Amino acid sequence: MAVFGESIIYKSREEIEIMRQAALVVSRTLGEVAKRLKPGITPAFLDQMAEDYIKSQGAIPGFKGLYGCPSTLLISVNEQVVHGLPTEKPIEEGDIVSVDCGAVFKGY
């Protein structure tokens, strides 16, 4: 890893490939969430499913534990604050749901 100045760190081709793999884990996780997102499902269920999926891919949840975050996904329903925590309240027909996810793969 080459360092330029004090703020830019160049990544090797190998590091970039690992970062790409981490991004693929996140993309696939969000795809799995989208498949299951429907009325009656709880954000807490989606969160556990996402954690299990990320771990099955050899990665770890990127948000869980970061700054004390207790969840794998950050889920906001309707006018809820951005990056809300998953709850047991079922999603209802017509709800607007936003989901954020992160994963760490081989340190990236």
Placement of each model-derived feature along the sequence:
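Active-site neighborhoods and metal-handling regions in enzymes and metal-associated proteins
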Residues: 1-108
